[in-house]
């Protein structure tokens, strides 16, 4: 399972949901950005670290974080 969070003010997390497919998480991310941001022309950039993907879209202190849930990590290690 993929978990999607919106990080604002540099550290506060807002949970956006669990997703099975990465494309579903990306679609939810884009829909949230479109309805919740004043940035009309976002420029998405990703950076990866371990099992986390950070997606910046142009805001100074806000970004999206995609992680693999703990349950999925356990299944992969077994």
Question: Over which residues does each language-model region extend?
Answer:
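N-terminal processing/targeting junctions
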Residues: 12, 25-26
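Residue-level detector of alpha-helical secondary structure
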Residues: 26, 30-33
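Conserved aromatic
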Residues: 16-22
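Short aromatic-glycine-(Arg/Gly/Cys) micro-motifs in beta-strand/loop hairpins
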Residues: 1-15
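Local beta-strand/beta-hairpin segments that build beta-sheet-rich folds
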Residues: 15-16, 61
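A short local loop/turn or secondary-structure capping micro-motif enriched for an aromatic residue
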Residues: 23-25, 63
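Short, mixed-charge low-complexity intrinsically disordered segments
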Residues: 34-78
């Amino acid at each position: 399972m993929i978990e999607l969070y919106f990080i604002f003010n540099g550290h506060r997390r807002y949970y956006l949901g669990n997703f099975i497919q990465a494309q579903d998480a990306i679609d939810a991310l884009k829909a949230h950005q479109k309805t919740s941001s004043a940035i009309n022309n976002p420029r998405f950039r990703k950076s990866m670290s371990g099992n986390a993907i950070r997606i910046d879209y142009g805001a100074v202190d806000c970004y999206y974080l995609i992680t693999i849930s703990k349950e999925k990590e356990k299944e992969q290690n077994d």
